């Protein structure tokens, strides 16, 4: 453990920030899983309700990813990659349904 006062403060701040970042990352993962579940439900039985649910969960996931990027929890390229992956999942099923 640190002996110097400023070092002790830095340890406390680092721990606080780590927990804050962890909550954002966890929320992003949770919303991503919910979105993929909604896409799977839509692909199993395509309907307007299932599509609406998938789009709603996509919007929530995008919002949380953008907030995490804005607060510096994840890098902007990482956020862009996550968002592209989410959008691609639904677009694949929409393309299959259209053809």
Swiss-Prot record:
| PANTHER family documented for this protein | 30S RIBOSOMAL PROTEIN S20, SMALL RIBOSOMAL SUBUNIT PROTEIN BS20C
Q: State the GO CC annotations.
A: cytosol; small ribosomal subunit
MF terms in GO: small ribosomal subunit rRNA binding; structural constituent of ribosome
UniProt keyword annotation of RNA-binding present: yes
> Keywords assigned by UniProt?
Ribonucleoprotein, Ribosomal protein, RNA-binding, rRNA-binding
Can you supply a Gene Ontology BP term from the record? Answer: translation
Q: What is stated as this protein's family in its record? A: Belongs to the bacterial ribosomal protein bS20 family.
Q: Which organism is it from?
A: Cyanothece sp. (strain PCC 7425 / ATCC 29141)
Residues folding into a coiled coil are none
Question: Is DNA repair one of the keywords?
Answer: no
State the name under which the record lists this protein.
Answer: Small ribosomal subunit protein bS20
UniProt cross-references to NCBIfam families, sorted A to Z: S20 (TIGR00029)
Function as written in the Swiss-Prot or TrEMBL entry: Binds directly to 16S ribosomal RNA.
